[in-house]
Amino acid sequence: MTRNQLHNWLNAGFFGLLLLLIHVQGQDSPEANPIRNTHTGQIQGSLIHVKDTKAGVHTFLGIPFAKPPVGPLRFAPPEAPEPWSGVRDGTAHPAMCLQNLDMLNEAGLPDMKMMLSSFPMSEDCLYLNIYTPAHAHEGSNLPVMVWIHGGALVIGMASMFDGSLLTVNEDLVVVTIQYRLGVLGFFSTGDQHARGNWGYLDQAAALRWVQQNIAHFGGNPDRVTIFGESAGGTSVSSHVVSPMSQGLFHGAIMESGVALLPDLISETSEMVSTTVAKLSGCEAMDSQALVRCLRGKSEAEILAINKVFKMIPAVVDGEFFPRHPKELLASEDFHPVPSIIGVNNDEFGWSIPVVMGSAQMIKGITRENLQAVLKDTAVQMMLPPECSDLLMEEYMGDTEDAQTLQIQFTEMMGDFMFVIPALQVAHFQRSHAPVYFYEFQHPPSYFKDVRPPHVKADHADEIPFVFASFFWGMKLDFTEEEELLSRRMMKYWANFARHGNPNSEGLPYWPVMDHDEQYLQLDIQPAVGRALKAGRLQFWTKTLPQKIQELKASQDKHREL
């Protein structure tokens, strides 16, 4: 697919979706206008007929699960939503949370920005969407899957992900939720005046809402699985370790994101709070005055501050995270739920370097400048610059060829950011509860004219296979083989949501990850693999820390002398 085709296809898909919605909403039958109760009032949804199936889906959009987090509730935990009288309209997508859409332009995705810009944006954004089979009713007790979107905790929205096909194909309830992003979601003063992690508290509030209400929509509150990708996977993993979220769900799926992702968790709020104070003109204040000053800023002023953050970390706040996730994972009283954890085989292949603005730098890597590039990279990884030699030895060896060096660099970054953290979390969890691990390996055919030919399964490539559609429910030109892979992946995910085990008759067997380190290679022909990246894991978790310790010891000795 060329960039031009992608542009035309995005537009056609978007307007096609609108026409479909308008057409179905126009039908005036009781079934076309479903009304359901919630603990705060009644909501009316729509009936959607899913193309190529005889089945219908009831959608309920923009349901509030918390009070608008504005005024005194900015930088405060979410509060229960206000009740309403009459029947609330649940046929329009909610406003997305405040975010910097210019990031998409900078990433060379103006079409995506154009589409997102057609949706309203507001600080009042704590809403969720529900997709449920049209036959479902109270007492249906269907499994529930709650999707948490990714986007580095700074960008994204619930409505980009259409749960209709997953709902229809697997006869379950899909919920997509929103949460505060960027500064509004994760600013912290590091004390009682603004502890932070507001976005995670929003997600927990949405999960509490699901517990209280999902039975009215045909869902089983005792069979809730949370799933998400990238920062959404990090969110899922964070709820698995947080004592505040215990009992709100029964299974977890982490796609290319866990609580140990290096850029999305921080011991201290200092760097973010200092930057925010400086940019907002609220400097030289104690934390109480800083929070008061920031609450007085307009949405436009907050957006301007958000622009400097391409990602933002959650913080060890003493409440949502009583200790660092690594300590929580290792603690005796850790009680995880059964989990699917996985990565793609080219996580840093294309889209992340483009979004982060490092694609040109990678293209310029040669043997001559490699040492300097690795020194800079080591510093960004918070490693001593002296570690650059070890990185070179492990990933590049004596290779002279520039393209090979560039590919090895992206493998190194993918391992550091995604693969190693995912394997570490899987190893912590598997001694307490079942873990099913996967590596997604299929490069989608519809991207072959958009991306460089060496890119394999890039970050987020598995999402359309799980939802059987691209953003906003747009149908993809899957090949027959891809159609089968998508059906299998939906079935694995749904089986797991239903029983805590992805396996069933007719599917290639997916073994639990035990001490034999088995995992599933998710490809056109799925196969069982063993000990994914065991050598790299050894390097990052044993060799490198040992080298850093030796360096520190010799520096300390040198200082004493």
From Swiss-Prot:
Tissue expression as described in the entry: Detected in liver (at protein level).
A Pfam family recorded for this sequence: COesterase
Catalytic activity: an O-acyl-(R)-carnitine + H2O = (R)-carnitine + a fatty acid + H(+); all-trans-retinyl hexadecanoate + H2O = all-trans-retinol + hexadecanoate + H(+)
Gene3D superfamilies documented for this protein: alpha/beta hydrolase
Listed GO MF terms: acylcarnitine hydrolase activity; all-trans-retinyl-palmitate hydrolase, all-trans-retinol forming activity
SS bond list: C97-C125, C282-C293
EC number: 3.1.1.28, 3.1.1.-
Localization of this protein: Microsome; Endoplasmic reticulum
Signal peptide bounds: 1-26
Induction comment: Up-regulated in liver by di-(2-ethylhexyl)phtalate (DEHP).
InterPro entries named among the record's database cross-references: AB_hydrolase_fold (IPR029058), CarbesteraseB (IPR002018), Carboxylesterase_B_AS (IPR019826), Carboxylesterase_B_CS (IPR019819), Type-B_Carboxylest/Lipase (IPR050309)
Superkingdom of the organism of origin: Eukaryota
Chain ranges for the short sequence motif Prevents secretion from ER as given in the UniProt record: 558-561
GO CC terms: endoplasmic reticulum; intracellular membrane-bounded organelle
Location of the active site: S230, E347, H459
Keywords: Disulfide bond, Endoplasmic reticulum, Hydrolase, Lipid metabolism, Microsome, Serine esterase, Signal
Family per similarity comment: Belongs to the type-B carboxylesterase/lipase family.
Function: Hydrolase with high activity towards palmitoylcarnitine. Is also active with p-nitrophenylacetate and alpha-naphthylacetate. May also hydrolyze retinyl esters.
PANTHER family: CARBOXYLESTERASE
Name recorded for this polypeptide: Acylcarnitine hydrolase
High-level lineage: Eukaryota, Metazoa, Chordata, Craniata, Vertebrata
UniProt gene name: Ces2c
